[in-house]
Amino acid sequence: MKFVLLFGVLLVTLFSYSSAEMLDDFDQADEDELLSLIEKEEARAKECTPRFYDCSHDRHSCCRSELFKDVCTCFYPEGGDNEVCTCQQPKHLKYMEKAAGKAKKFGGKIKKWFG
């Protein structure tokens, strides 16, 4: 009976040790993957198209504003046959950014009063 109990404890210990090593390997792989994604994002961020500039070459290259990414909007100018695409911020997102800025400012005042 003691032998079975000792064998069971040994088996559980080995199993937990091997699963911990596997989790460490997965965590390391996740960290490496996350770092590579961050590096790609930084490289991509350097090539973004500023607001009101032509984005017809790459419609997903618009820069980010404080909270939201600008959108490549295409239209035909009056009396023209050529399509023009520029990076623009939709009005509803512009208003949301203004509201968030005012809320942040108001929150700072409340923190100053009570903090």
Swiss-Prot record:
Disulfide bonds join C48-C63, C55-C72, C62-C87, C74-C85. Transmembrane segments: none annotated. Expressed by the venom gland. It is found in: Secreted. InterPro entries: Spider_toxin_CSTX_knottin (IPR019553), Spider_toxin_CSTX_Knottin_CS (IPR011142). The keyword DNA-binding does not apply. This is U3-lycotoxin-Ls1k. It comes from Lycosa singoriensis (Wolf spider).
